Amino acid sequence: GGTIASQEGEDGLEPKTTGQQMLDLIPELQGLCEIDCVDLLNLDSTNMQPEEWAVMAKAAFEGMKNHDGIVITHGTDTCAYSAAALDTMLTNPKVPVVLTGSQLPAGEADSDAAHNIHDAFLAACGAPEGVYLAFDGRVIHGLWATKIRTMGFDAFVSVNCPYAGKIADGKLMMQETAKEKTVAAATVESAVDVRLDSKVAVFKLIPGFDPVLLETVVDLGYHGVVLEAYGCGGITNYRRNLLPAIEKMIHKGMVVAATTQSTFDGCDLSQYEVGVRALKLGVIPAGDLTTEALVVRTMIALGRWTDKKDIEAFLRGDMSPVDRSVPLTAFIE
């Protein structure tokens, strides 16, 4: 983990605390379950990269063969990327795989580490099979988590998908949708697939964005681009027109996908002319997917397939079980 396992070093906080040292801070875990502790990595999450996603996915897959649940402590800054990666790399995991972290190091007074670790173990013991992030009393499906705070304990929210569950007064309560997903997948064989292509760039559009920036990635050997577009999927096509550069990328065989800069409600390129023209060129709309999830799935799609139809089908969003008439936070409030 990052912050959760950090201690003061020569140049600031750095990961040093072992898994067992963290567990020793939480006597409430005694009697809850039997724990095997593995120090898999000890990295600030800023330094977590696609190679580490593969390490975690393989370790989780091996661990679930003789355990009833998996807990992974992780730095918060890139935890949403790792959660999305594990959710995608692990097909139908047979146990709950639960990531967690903290905003203050485990050894500090008033740290949220013990609370979050305890909640993660409750989820690992009682949640349906799947990948989750447990944080500040909330359980989020792995693909739909995003970090919204740098310091507040309620650092993560579920985006465009109902919360999987909540933990209150030491009790885990799961949404029915999470249980239904498990029943539907019960006959699918469990597997791990860590293939990916990390040559993916992300561009956040801003007023005055220079199309030359998009053209550079073609010559640098990138295979995919994620565009953080405006609103429902607006991509500039006036004055500093981005469409010729996008057309060039697609003609060269690159995958170009679009999401929104807005946190909630997703991307729909079919609503406005500034989205429709990009859609006609072959830009893939990511629907409900967050930027983190889209980046991860683009890398994984490029690693698994060469056929654009397969990649597009994999990247198109709208996969979350969302009832737009019900607030996403209804279950946890």
Protein language model regions, located:
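Accessory alpha-helical/coil subdomains and C-terminal extensions
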Residues: 2, 18-19, 24-29, 141-227, ...
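Internal gly/pro-rich beta-alpha loop/helix module
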Residues: 99-169
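C-terminal non-catalytic interaction/assembly regions of soluble proteins
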Residues: 232-333
